[in-house]
Swiss-Prot record:
<dbReference type="Pfam" id="PF08111">
    <property type="entry name" value="Pea-VEAacid"/>
</dbReference>
<dbReference type="GO" id="GO:0005184">
    <property type="term" value="F:neuropeptide hormone activity"/>
</dbReference>
<dbReference type="GO" id="GO:0005576">
    <property type="term" value="C:extracellular region"/>
</dbReference>
<dbReference type="GO" id="GO:0007218">
    <property type="term" value="P:neuropeptide signaling pathway"/>
</dbReference>
<protein>
    <recommendedName>
        <fullName>Peptide hormone 2</fullName>
    </recommendedName>
</protein>
<dbReference type="InterPro" id="IPR012593">
    <property type="entry name" value="Pea-VEAacid"/>
</dbReference>
<keyword id="KW-0527">Neuropeptide</keyword>
Amino acid sequence: LDLTPGSHVDSYVEA
């Protein structure tokens, strides 16, 4: 899981 700020995952997790 790529939980780095601005990653593809964080893109919709913190949206």
